[in-house]
Structures are given as structure tokens and as C-alpha cells.
Amino acid sequence: MTFKGFDKDFNITDKVAVVTGAASGIGKAMAELFSEKGAYVVLLDIKEDVKDVAAQINPSRTLALQVDITKKENIEKVVAEIKKVYPKIDILANSAGVALLEKAEDLPEEYWDKTMELNLKGSFLMAQIIGREMIATGGGKIVNMASQASVIALDKHVAYCASKAAIVSMTQVLAMEWAPYNINVNAISPTVILTELGKKAWAGQVGEDMKKLIPAGRFGYPEEVAACALFLVSDAASLITGENLIIDGGYTIK
């Protein structure tokens, strides 16, 4: 591949991008940016208001589907619906997830199960089923949302840390297995991101204490994560696969 210039290499015009967790937070930011950069965007979320988000972004170039991605049959039905509208899927951005926090000795079993089911199983099933489509149609780009918790230990995050570390390992295996099919698979590991949930979880002194541990001195914004995702799903990142891009203001280098 030769460098074609920024306008072409970073261009995703008319690509079909599927984004999970698209009703809010990082997923919503990715859906908005992908659409702004010319992609057709399929927004998936278990919340019904994903349809309102799609309407706000671009009604003529988006498709919103309400789905629980922890069930294989649900994803298969969604992919069938997508194929009625678009000839192929070029991009998958896995952003759906949950954080249920408790000390390890007190963690309810259902917290563990729900975390693994959505964060890990849901992301795998999405990648598996859409990966098959990409193999059949000549390739694609997959971005899995991990976390700084994939590489460091965080208090009360035992289930979350385990699920996100597994996401990175899964990403590496998928990248290795699917490279011959022209499929790039990468992960993104953000620090605390100022989504609505992030703002609530890290409000007050706990947030101020956390920021003191970040060399950059601040938390991140959903748009910053979306920009990195855009790079990874563009031709500019065609030789990058199996990587875990850490977006944490230097937190994990300390």
C-alpha cells in the first residue's frame, strides 16, 4: 500500500459501520463521528432511545436496531436485517459494556456473570458473527472497547478488570486468525471518560484524587476515543492489528 494522502487514507466515506452501545457515551460519539466522516452507520443498543440518536445523527444514512447482544440468535437476526439494507459490513465497533463494582470478597455472583456476559461474550459474539461476514466479503476493521483496567488493577473492579483484560487477549487472537482475510482487529483502552455515567461515577473528591494520578491531569472525552477509533478503522491503520491503544493521559506509565 502507498500513502494516498490524508483525505483518502483517513476516509471512510460510504463504508458501513456497525456500532454497539450506540445510544450513549463512547458508542454514540463513534456513531456520530463515523457518520460525519461519510459512513453509513448501524446503531445497536438495548435501549430504545438508540432510534432517537440515529434520527439526530442522519436519518438517511443510519439504521437503528434495539438488540440484546448477549444472545447469539439476536445478533444473527440483526445482521440479517442489516444485509437487507447494505451489501456488506466494513466496520464493527464494539462499545457496549457495563461496570458493576464491589470488593472481590463481596462481589455478587450475578455481578460477575452480567459483566462477563455483556463485556466479553457480547463483544465476542458480535465479532464472530460479523467476522464471518467480513471473511466472506473480503475483509474489514474491528475495534473492541477495552479499558485501562485491562492492564492495571483497580480497586473494586475485579470483574471489570478481568473482562477487559480478556477483551485484549481476544482481540489479539482474532487479529492473528483473521489477518489472512484482510481483517484488522484492535482494542482501545481509555481512562475515565466523561460520559454521563463517567461524570456521575467520578464526581467530587474521588474524581479529583483520580486525576492527580494521571500525568495529563484530566479525564478524557468520548470524542477523543472516537477519533482514535476513526484512525483504527481507516486505511491509515491498515498495517495495525492486534494492538491495544491506550488513551489514558499517561496513567498506566507511572
Swiss-Prot record:
Q: Which reaction does it catalyse?
A: glycerol + NAD(+) = dihydroxyacetone + NADH + H(+)
InterPro entries in the record: NAD(P)-bd_dom_sf (IPR036291), Sc_DH/Rdtase_CS (IPR020904), SDR_fam (IPR002347)
Keywords carried by this UniProt record:
Cytoplasm, Glycerol metabolism, Magnesium, Manganese, NAD, Oxidoreductase
* EC code: 1.1.1.6
| Location of the active site | 160
Q: How is its activity regulated?
A: Inhibited by Zn(2+).
| Example of a GO cellular component annotation carried by this entry | cytoplasm
Please give one Gene Ontology molecular function term for this protein: glycerol dehydrogenase (NAD+) activity
What sort of enzyme, by top EC class, is this? oxidoreductase
- Name the cofactor(s) required for activity, per the record: Mg(2+); Mn(2+)
Q: Which Gene3D superfamilies does the entry link to?
A: NAD(P)-binding Rossmann-like Domain (3.40.50.720)
From the Swiss-Prot or TrEMBL record, state where the protein is found.
Cytoplasm
Signals that turn on the gene: Repressed by GolR.
Pfam families, alphabetically? adh_short_C2 (PF13561)
Q: Which domain of life is it from?
A: Bacteria
Could you tell me which SUPFAM superfamilies the record lists for this protein?
Answer: NAD(P)-binding Rossmann-fold domains
Write out the residues that bind NAD(+): 18-47, 164
- Its Gene Ontology biological processes? glycerol catabolic process
- What protein family is recorded? Belongs to the short-chain dehydrogenases/reductases (SDR) family.
* Function in brief: Involved in the glycerol metabolism. Catalyzes the NAD-dependent oxidation of glycerol to dihydroxyacetone (glycerone). GolD specifically uses NAD.
Q: What is this protein called?
A: NAD-dependent glycerol dehydrogenase
Which source organism? Listeria innocua serovar 6a (strain ATCC BAA-680 / CLIP 11262)
Its lineage reads: Bacteria, Bacillati, Bacillota, Bacilli, Bacillales
Whichever gene encodes this chain, its name is golD
